[in-house]
Amino acid sequence: MAEKIKLDSVDRQILHDLQDHGRMTNVDLARNAGISAPPCLRRVRALEDAGIIKGYHADIDSDALGYSVQVFAFVGLTSQAEIDLQDFETLVSTWPQVRECHMLMGETDFLLKIVAHDWDDFQKFLTSHLTPAKNVSHVKTALSIRSAKQLVGVPISQT
């Protein structure tokens, strides 16, 4: 978990710019934040050390790599004991098709975002990995027809 630190407007500008443009140079980042490059780099490193910046990633077009199927799976478990929840999360982390895993409150225990090349690929994953997994009691799926919005990170205000 990220260490709580007080962010000023310069830190927020740096975070905003890096979240939108992860490859922005330190010089451009400093210019946008209104400071020189050396203190800007120190601030970026401090934000990384505090766990606020967790990494830098490329936004890859899944269709371009042949992943044309995106499915959301609502997974119910037989047991919600903490050890069983952790075991399921550990198992899910080994499946590259699962891009996101969220534990939910309510009738469903987990929501998984799964990508696949095609329906056969998804069905194979579903029947050979997800549904027979230990402690899984039921799985409901919903096919994503299209995505209207996919933003990473969080809204960053300047105040």
Each model region followed by its residue ranges:
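A compositional/biophysical signature of low hydrophobicity enriched in polar/charged and small residues
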Residues: 1-159
